[in-house]
Amino acid sequence: MVREIIFLHVGQCGNQLGHEFWSVAIKEHLNKKINEKRELVGKHSFMNDSASSFFENVYKNFNLNQKESLKARAILIDTETGVANEIMKSSISPYFDENNIFTQHSGAGNNWSQGYMYYGKMYETLIDNIIRKNVEKCDSLQSFYITSSLGGGTGSGLGSYILEMLSDNYKQIKFSNCVFPSACDDVITSPYNSFFALTKIHEFSNCVLPVSNDALLDILNSKKLKEKKNDKNDYSKMNNIVANVILNLTSSMRFEGSLNVDINEICTNLIPYPFFNFMLSSLSPCVETENIRTFDHLFKNVLNRNNQMLIANPKDGLSLSMAFLVRGNINISDVTKNVLLIKNNLNILRYNKDATKIGLCNVSPLNQPYSLLCLINSCEIRNSFLQILERFNKLFKRKAHLHHYLEYLTMDDILEFKEKIQNLIFEYSYIQKNSFCSPKFLNRNTINILGYDICEENDTHDNNYINLESSNPYYLKSKIKKCDKSISWFDFKTKPII
């Protein structure tokens, strides 16, 4: 059964990421080496049914000479026309439907509140109509995939509004691929924009895959790919790295494989509680020119700092779950062996050590024999949130540029945003310290059925009941008599407690 994905590229950065992604995705699907065994698909066809997850007009009698009728399931949204015009003048323009392009001329002024409060409400109906028309073309819509930046006004503000609108109107998975601005971003108000957008993305996305400009620049420096004369600029190379992350993430949905993984499975297997929905991602190789000596070398590199999409060390944080998505003609035993080696180097939640997802796509990436994308739901992500909060506080304490936002927001609104970010940091820090989530994520009725009760920190323990083992959180007390130890905390991992 076809499971379609609709891509929404919002703002300048989001559309540039979309341009890079679709440029390579189209090459992969049309590449003769990938499609050299076309007779397996059909006598006159060159694409299989899985391609219809990402493209419209994929017919069984589709011919190479008619490839321009193929249309990407992509919607381009921006409050300026520059990037969209560049895309429509590029070599891949025939693959985009002009009816799926929404642009304006005013821009959002690098102001989250203007993009969210003003343009969001103004263009809601127009954008919603475009989305609905694309949804109606799908047989079985699987998810929405949104690319945007948190530093500007359109990607952060209008992107947040669109994400909230999707959450209200559709039950499908919302997957956000957002770019955190660097510490020396040229947009002076980016600390405000990223701060406000982060709360909305966390609240209305099912899964968030953040990347940071600082980490991408570090990758370019480490791979010695800084801008050269007559070569791509650094931004294009950074976008290409992120595009490769998306390509690896979606490879199992686009091509055949022995262990296919779709986006729904990522959300189901890697997110133990809806609140903890951020993923650390790392890619090996990061660039096409990188030399990978052996398959084992992929796994040795993937946890290195210079392969991380955020400035974070997964080894320092508590890992709640993880996924390894591999491309290439690889034996599953080689993957399993290397996964075990990586897990030995990570601090994994002790009662959830088996929370590992493996995906194998048989089709190699362009210009490389194989590649690996590693996703880790790690508490180390909280350091990125701390940086966003600190940059916000530096401006907020001085009320610098705040009047631009007070036109649409009140001080109470801003303080509420701050409380949400602080709570986000607290919850990740809590589970990092205690290895258990805070009690507010548990369903009391289910806990009682399992023979436990949730107690407050100041509750006194009844002498008639046993104390829980040290592996149990403080807020659970047993309702079982001393003679009955039939239920333990570890039983919870196979039962619905949220």
Model-predicted segments: where are they?
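Terminal, contiguous helix-loop blocks that mediate binding/assembly
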Residues: 1-459, 465-498
